[in-house]
């Protein structure tokens, strides 16, 4: 579950 959150955060950071 936490892995999914970390992956989502990484995706958002990548869009910046």
UniProtKB/Swiss-Prot annotation:
Antimicrobial peptide active against Gram-positive bacterium S.epidermidis ATCC 12228 (MIC=8 uM) and against yeast C.parapsilosis ATCC 22019 (MIC=64 uM) but not against Gram-negative bacterium E.coli ATCC 25922. Has hemolytic and cytotoxic activity. It is found in: Secreted. Keywords: Amidation, Amphibian defense peptide, Antibiotic, Antimicrobial, Cytolysis, Fungicide, Hemolysis, Secreted. The modification Leucine amide is found at residue 16. GO terms for biological process: defense response to bacterium; defense response to fungus; killing of cells of another organism. Belongs to the frog skin active peptide (FSAP) family. Temporin subfamily. This is Temporin-1ITa. One of its GO terms (cellular component) is extracellular region. It comes from Rana italica (Italian stream frog). The keyword Secreted applies. Expressed by the skin glands.
């Amino acid at each position: 579950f936490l892995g999914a959150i970390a992956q989502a955060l990484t995706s958002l950071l990548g869009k910046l």
